[in-house]
Amino acid sequence: MQQDGQAEEPMIRRAKAYIAGHHADPIGLDEIARSMHVSTFYFCKMFKKSTGLTFTDYLSRVRVEKAKDLLMNLRLRVSDIAYMAGFQSLTHFNRLFRRLTGECPTRFRDNNSNRANALETNFKDGRFASKGIVSLAA
């Protein structure tokens, strides 16, 4: 999500890569800015200009996207998924997930579980193997 069609600053690319790799860890704005050798104010300004989102909103969206992926694994409990995605509170996770997706995590899982089950079944039955697609879980 880049604004104005400008090339993304290396600082922002590094910050986004760090967030992607550490979304489950507590990530502080001051910590990120310091690691980029800039003030918190400057980092916030540049991050918002580049992504169109505040640092906190961007981090929340990354965590919700990770949670959406994890919700496809029907063996994981929603509470475990919340913590795996980086949320410190199940209540906060539920509230934010609903605000960003329009539905609660359980409903999201239910609405998408048929797709997840079909993919799992097709991999187990070898239906994708004939098309050159193999399961990485095997």
Protein language model regions, located:
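Core residues of bacterial helix-turn-helix
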Residues: 35-36, 85-86, 97
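Terminal helix-turn-helix DNA-binding modules in bacterial transcription factors
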Residues: 13-21, 26-30, 49-89, 110-138
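An amphipathic alpha-helical interaction segment
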Residues: 1-14, 30, 35-38, 42-44
